[in-house]
């Protein structure tokens, strides 16, 4: 017989048959036999906490038998794709068994710890993003924040302020102010004094007094009633006339003394005229009072309503003479 290769005995393990220890996951998994051949072993442990796989006990028996693979495969040269796939399946099987051994509480604590570990990382990433900005970008962002309200203010300032006259035309007010009212009232009184008109009053015989004056219309408080018309004389002439009138008992006293611009004057209304101001009777609680009215720097004595006066009411004012001689001569001055 010629020279050649010796025939190998069946079942000696050289033709690629795997031993029982390799099938059952014995010690040959970590220490495989190396007889000059390349051996591929997979032992890396990867813990998948997010999606744990099912335990091999949950698989059906048929699937368990079909899933049995060899941990060790001897091949000459490069490993085939089938051996790689078988090694990956075996790794997943080992990982699933290890995960199933861990209790559920431990897995929950580990998941919580992972969540707590990931959350601050996200916050730090946001802070790191802000810190990672260059200084120029930071200044620009700050300027943008500061300029935003300023833009609003400028827009408000630029917006035109609408006035009431933009919608409604200007009309002259018919209302009169205080100065205008006083000026018109003065002009009216000046006209009445200069013309001698006496409106709203008349002479009336009063029981126990004689002649008197009553109102023929209503007067409001502060309204002009009538002028005490007479001769305007100085104090020296007034004293001389008063002495002469005192000699005649039939002559009454119609003299009124006052001061104007630090000068004493007297209005002598003793002479009988058609003016009604001289006929108004005396009363300490009268409804009228005297007031000086200037017309071209000439004082005039007028009577003004102290309160509202009704129609038919007698006009009265206080003569102001408190001298004893006058009271003795005219006792009605006491009232």
UniProtKB/Swiss-Prot annotation:
Key words, A-Z: Cell cycle, Cell division, Chromatin regulator, Chromosome, Methyltransferase, Mitosis, Nucleus, Repressor, S-adenosyl-L-methionine, Transcription, Transcription regulation, Transferase
Residue stretches of biased makeup (Basic and acidic residues): 67-91
**Catalytic reactions of this protein:** L-lysyl(20)-[histone H4] + S-adenosyl-L-methionine = N(6)-methyl-L-lysyl(20)-[histone H4] + S-adenosyl-L-homocysteine + H(+); L-lysyl-[protein] + S-adenosyl-L-methionine = N(6)-methyl-L-lysyl-[protein] + S-adenosyl-L-homocysteine + H(+)
Family recorded in the similarity comment: Belongs to the class V-like SAM-binding methyltransferase superfamily. Histone-lysine methyltransferase family. PR/SET subfamily.
Q: One Pfam family this chain carries?
A: SET
Where, subcellularly, is it found?
A: Nucleus; Chromosome
Q: What does this protein do?
A: Protein-lysine N-methyltransferase that monomethylates both histones and non-histone proteins. Specifically monomethylates 'Lys-20' of histone H4 (H4K20me1). H4K20me1 is enriched during mitosis and represents a specific tag for epigenetic transcriptional repression. Mainly functions in euchromatin regions, thereby playing a central role in the silencing of euchromatic genes. Required for cell proliferation, probably by contributing to the maintenance of proper higher-order structure of DNA during mitosis. Involved in chromosome condensation and proper cytokinesis.
* Domain of life of the native organism: Eukaryota
Entry keyword annotation includes Repressor: yes
Q: Which InterPro entries match?
A: KMT5A, KMT5A-like, KMT5A-like_SET, SET_dom, SET_dom_sf
Name used for this protein in its record: N-lysine methyltransferase KMT5A-A
Q: Quick one: which gene encodes this? A: kmt5a-a
Q: What is its EC number?
A: 2.1.1.-, 2.1.1.361
Keyword Transcription set for record: yes
Give start and end of each SET domain. Answer: 199-320
Enumerate composition-biased segments (Basic residues): 145-161
Q: Where is this region: Disordered?
A: 1-91, 133-183
Kindly list the GO CC terms recorded for this protein: nucleus; polytene chromosome
List GO molecular-function terms, semicolon-separated. histone H4K20 methyltransferase activity; histone H4K20 monomethyltransferase activity; histone methyltransferase activity
Binding positions (S-adenosyl-L-methionine): 209-211, 254, 281-282
Q: What class of enzyme is it?
A: transferase
């Amino acid at each position: 017989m010629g020279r050649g290769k010796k025939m190998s005995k069946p079942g000696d393990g050289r033709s690629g048959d795997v031993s029982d220890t390799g099938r059952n996951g014995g010690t040959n998994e970590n220490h495989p036999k190396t007889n000059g051949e390349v051996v591929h072993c997979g032992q890396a442990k990867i813990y998948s906490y997010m999606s744990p796989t099912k335990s091999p006990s949950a698989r059906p028996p048929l699937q368990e038998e079909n899933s049995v693979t060899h941990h060790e495969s001897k091949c000459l040269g490069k490993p085939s794709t089938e051996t790689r796939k078988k090694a990956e399946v075996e790794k997943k099987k080992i990982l699933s068994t290890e995960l199933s051994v861990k209790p559920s509480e431990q897995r929950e604590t580990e998941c919580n710890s992972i969540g707590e570990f990931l959350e601050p990382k996200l916050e730090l990433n946001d802070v790191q993003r802000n810190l990672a900005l260059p200084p120029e970008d930071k200044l620009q962002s700050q300027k943008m924040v500061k300029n935003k309200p300023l833009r609003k203010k400028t827009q408000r300032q630029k917006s035109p302020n609408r006035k009431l006259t933009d919608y409604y035309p200007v009309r002259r007010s018919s209302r009169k102010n205080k100065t205008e009212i006083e000026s018109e009232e003065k002009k009216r009184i000046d006209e009445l004094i200069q013309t001698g008109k006496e409106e709203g009053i008349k002479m009336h015989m009063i029981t126990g007094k004689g002649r008197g004056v009553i109102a023929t219309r209503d007067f409001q408080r502060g309204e002009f009633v009538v002028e005490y018309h007479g001769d305007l004389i100085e104090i020296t002439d007034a004293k001389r006339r008063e002495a002469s009138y005192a000699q005649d008992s039939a002559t009454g006293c119609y003299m009124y003394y006052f001061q104007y611009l630090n000068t004493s004057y007297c209005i002598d209304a003793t002479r009988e005229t058609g003016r009604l101001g001289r006929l108004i009777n005396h009363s300490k609680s009268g409804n009228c009072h005297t007031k000086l009215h200037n017309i071209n720097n000439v004082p005039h004595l007028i009577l003004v309503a102290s309160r509202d006066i009704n129609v038919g009411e007698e006009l009265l004012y206080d003569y102001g003479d408190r001298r004893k001689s006058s009271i003795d001569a005219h006792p009605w001055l006491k009232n």
